[in-house]
Design a protein with these regions (language model features):
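Alpha/beta-hydrolase fold catalytic core
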Residues: 156-201, 207-212
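C-terminal, loop-rich substrate-recognition/catalytic regions characterized by aromatic stacking residues
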Residues: 117-165, 241, 251, 284-315
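Alpha/beta-hydrolase fold nucleophile elbow
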Residues: 1-7
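Mobile gating loops/cap/lid regions near enzyme active sites that modulate substrate access
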Residues: 189-315
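Catalytic nucleophile loop
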Residues: 9-13
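Surface-exposed patches in mature extracellular/periplasmic domains of secreted proteins
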Residues: 1, 66-79, 175, 206-210, ...
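Short, flexible loop/turn elements at secondary-structure junctions
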Residues: 7, 35, 84, 124-127, ...
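Substrate-access "cap/lid" subdomains that shape
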Residues: 14-18, 23, 28, 32-150, ...
Length: 315
């Protein structure tokens, strides 16, 4: 059994890798552009510095829906059952993952760091311009000073050493730098965390990719989700032949991995294993290539920052 998903689906893969309840239920995993980080994990019973407890959030939502000062009283269940389907849908409150003592007895950042996750062959990766889907040019800071002020505000005292990585060198790079920050802090750090955790356990079949093909404009980076039509072979009929070839290659990689636990096979460009020393990844582009330690300095610093935020939030 091979499980795989993208974005929210990638977050599901991340979650299944982390929970002991899924042990032995699958044999391989592919995570595309996961985004679960320590700052969007909620604890069931306790506030964790990033958010209030899941129970408090739920109680507040129910109280608001029932127009109650607090959720108490013998008639609370009847009032809850009186809600219409639409009213229930309107209660939606996004929570990425809840540490509940059952599915997870600790935060995933600890599970992956100690190597106690479900250790199966894994492909994990990200697109080189994930943030292009979420950052608009007209919303980017107008000056270098504005961008630095924004970074300092976002990163705080714990992220002082990270600020310079995400302030442009000149005003022509302001937008691209915003895209970098959005990509790295959400998707790329989390995807890389899975590769590092897997390699740390000695899992030989650990593979990391960077998807870098923008079919609309090959001179631009690949935004969030752009790899999906390539994986499923659903590019438009008018797509260039080289894009269709890349799509077939990616489909072959995914299927080969599902069958054997490695994307490598006869007639396929060699995809190097990811290990802690070389940190090699496959660049899925036209043409296919390999890279090593993709922007290692800032991503290592991003990891340290996220860990520091997590530790500070526990106290």
């Amino acid at each position: 059994v091979t499980i795989f998903g993208e974005s929210a689906g990638g977050a599901s893969i991340y979650s299944l890798l982390a929970t002991p309840m899924a042990k032995s239920l699958f044999h391989k995993a592919i995570s595309e552009s996961t985004w679960i980080n320590a700052d969007n994990v909620t604890d069931l019973k306790n506030a964790n510095g990033f958010s209030e407890s899941a129970e408090v959030l739920g109680e507040r939502a129910i109280a608001a829906a029932l127009d109650l000062a607090q959720v108490t009283g013998p008639d609370i269940l009847s009032k809850m059952r009186s809600l219409s389907a639409q009213e229930i849908l309107d209660l939606e409150h996004g929570v990425a993952l809840i540490v509940d003592g059952w599915l997870y007895d600790k935060a995933p950042i600890e599970i992956f760091e100690e190597g106690s996750h479900n250790n199966v062959p894994i492909i994990t990766g990200y697109n080189d311009g994930e943030g292009l889907m979420f950052i608009r040019p007209d919303r980017a800071p107008a000056t270098l000073s504005d961008q630095r002020s924004l970074r300092v505000q976002q990163l705080g005292n714990l992220g002082v050493d990270l600020v310079d990585f995400y302030v442009a060198e000149d005003e022509g790079q302001l937008f691209d730098t915003e895209v970098d920050y959005s990509s790295d802090s959400v998707f790329i750090r989390a995807s890389r965390e899975l590769a590092l955790a897997s390699a740390l356990t000695g899992q030989q079949d650990t593979y990391l990719y960077v998807f870098a093909r923008n079919s609309r404009d090959p001179s631009q980076r690949a935004a969030h989700f752009m790899e999906v039509p390539y994986v499923f072979g659903t590019l438009p009929e008018r797509a260039p032949g080289e894009d269709k070839e890349l799509s077939q290659l990616m489909n072959d990689y995914w299927v080969q991995f599902a069958k054997t636990g490695t994307p490598n096979g006869q007639g396929l460009p060699v995809w190097p294993r990811y290990d802690l020393e070389k940190q090699m990844h496959q660049v899925l582009d036209v043409p296919i290539s390999q890279g090593a330690t993709d922007r290692k300095a800032q991503l290592d610093e991003m990891d340290r920052y996220m860990r520091a935020r997590y530790e500070a939030a526990k106290h």
